[in-house]
């Protein structure tokens, strides 16, 4: 469950290390986001020479959540950390590599490029 002010790790090589959620997209009163949701975030820490810089406002998709997600078969999937991948406006990732596992539910929201770059899809 991601809301405003939540800190997330960045699971790609775009240059950002940590981002803070500013807004969960998808409705005017939307408070919480989960795996597969797009958020607007601010870069809180970044590596030197990266594509994105500290203080930049970016869009990102949530790929891992501590709260987890209930699947249609009744099972749950949970992760140890909250993580996101920085994306462009056309839902393509800004980085060229994805680190760590991602949830299969990203396929429903047409993030197929992220799924193909990920080392493991759960």
UniProtKB/Swiss-Prot annotation:
Keyword Ribosomal protein applies: yes
One term of GO molecular function: large ribosomal subunit rRNA binding
Presence of the UniProt keyword Ion transport in the record: no
Any one GO CC term of the record: cytosolic large ribosomal subunit
Superkingdom as given in the UniProt entry: Bacteria
One GO-annotated biological process of the protein: translation
Keywords annotated in UniProt: Ribonucleoprotein, Ribosomal protein, RNA-binding, rRNA-binding
PROSITE patterns in the cross-refs: RIBOSOMAL_L14 (PS00049)
Pfam family, one: Ribosomal_L14
Record's subunit section: Part of the 50S ribosomal subunit. Forms a cluster with proteins L3 and L19. In the 70S ribosome, L14 and L19 interact and together make contacts with the 16S rRNA in bridges B5 and B8.
Family: Belongs to the universal ribosomal protein uL14 family.
Function: Binds to 23S rRNA. Forms part of two intersubunit bridges in the 70S ribosome.
Name the UniProt record assigns to this protein: Large ribosomal subunit protein uL14
Origin species: Clostridium perfringens (strain 13 / Type A)
């Amino acid at each position: 469950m991601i809301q405003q002010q939540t800190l997330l790790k960045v699971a790609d090589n775009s240059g950002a290390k940590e981002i803070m959620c500013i807004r969960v997209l998808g409705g005017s009163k939307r408070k919480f986001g989960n795996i597969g949701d797009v958020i607007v975030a601010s870069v809180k820490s970044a590596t030197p020479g990266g594509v994105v810089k500290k203080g930049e406002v970016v869009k990102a998709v949530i790929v891992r959540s501590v709260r987890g997600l209930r699947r249609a078969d009744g099972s749950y999937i949970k992760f140890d950390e909250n993580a996101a991948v920085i994306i462009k406006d056309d839902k393509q990732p800004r980085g060229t590599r994805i680190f760590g596992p991602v949830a299969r539910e990203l396929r429903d929201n047409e993030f197929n490029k992220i799924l193909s770059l990920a080392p493991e899809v759960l």
